[in-house]
UniProtKB/Swiss-Prot annotation:
The lineage of its organism: Bacteria, Pseudomonadati, Pseudomonadota, Gammaproteobacteria, Chromatiales. This is Large ribosomal subunit protein uL23. InterPro entries: Nucleotide-bd_a/b_plait_sf, Ribosomal_uL23-like, Ribosomal_uL23/eL15/eS24_sf. NCBIfam families: PRK05738.1-3, PRK05738.2-4. Pfam families: Ribosomal_L23 (PF00276).
Amino acid sequence: MNEERLTKVILAPVISEKSTLVGEKHNQVIFKILSDADKREVKQAVELLFDVKVTKVHTALVKGKRKRSGRYIGRRSNWKKAYVALQEGYEIDFASVE
């Protein structure tokens, strides 16, 4: 797989209450990813960028919500997220990652 493509697959970590609970309980990390990325690309990208071993990847499409601004109704974009399960003994600390 092209390394340039792998560096662009992961857009951002998802930091929320649910993601911290999943991280503590199941040793998983949640990322916002490109909408056309597949599980294989996500696994390779995480292993390349964070130097960890990945055991499993689950992906989910998140539907954009309808939002209102005054009398105008708009819609947020759909996006894709990946639940990445790390091997025992590995972890990703976003506070120390540059």
